[in-house]
Regions:
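Catalytic metal-binding/acid-base residues of hydrolase active sites
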Residues: 1-2, 30
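Glycine/threonine-rich beta-strand-loop-alpha-helix active-site module
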Residues: 2-8
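Short, surface-exposed connector motifs at secondary-structure boundaries
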Residues: 96-101
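Claisen-condensing/thiolase-fold acyl-transfer catalytic domains that form or cleave C-C bonds
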Residues: 81, 85, 103-185
């Protein structure tokens, strides 16, 4: 839930974020389906570009300093375009995939320009990226689970589709996974 972390007077962040929650239930799937690779990373040198100010501070009782998200949009954008693509490529290599194998890109819903840059890098039309940013804004850690749930409920995924999930976040951190969709019994 981002509304409590965003300073509503900060035009650099207030208009970008939405509230959301999501989860993914992981269970046994037939051989050849499910997650095929994971990539996770972090680089604390980028921490000053995206962080929750005051989140880890113990303040005296009565002190009014709510934790607020602080970001350097230009630096976060450059980081996101680079690491989203790099980590997604690494996840594909680990899974033995190429960009031609991708049926759907399911990216973190931070900024449509970042998603467009990822599609361009992988030679995918934007229609092959699951997006809901225009409806909900950046829902932070909920964005990929929400995108998965929405696409599945719309019947967009077919049994055996190759999904490439990729995201990034505060700190600065990143992750990607390749998965083969199982439509279930």
């Amino acid at each position: 839930v981002m509304s409590g972390a965003v300073d509503q007077n900060d035009r650099n962040t207030a208009i970008l974020f939405g509230d959301g929650a999501g989860c993914v239930v992981i269970g046994e799937v037939p051989q050849g389906y499910g997650f095929q690779s994971f990539v996770l990373g972090a680089d604390s040198a980028g921490g000053p570009h995206l962080y929750l100010r005051g989140a880890a501070l113990r303040l005296p009782e009565g002190t009014e300093m709510g934790p607020h998200l602080t970001q350097n949009g230009r630096e976060v954008f450059k980081f996101a375009v680079r690491t989203l693509g790099d980590s997604a490529e690494q996840a594909m290599r680990q899974a033995g995939m190429s960009t031609a194998d991708i049926d759907w890109l399911v990216p973190h819903q931070a900024n449509i320009r970042i998603i467009e840059a990822a599609c361009e890098r992988f030679g995918l039309p934007l229609e092959r990226a699951v997006t809901n940013l225009e409806r909900y804004g950046n829902t932070s850690a909920a964005s990929i689970p929400l995108a998965l749930a929405e696409a599945e409920s719309q019947g967009r995924f077919r049994d055996g589709d190759q999904l490439l999930l990729a995201g990034f976040g505060g700190g600065l951190s990143w992750g990607a996974a390749a998965a083969r969709w199982w439509a279930g019994p």
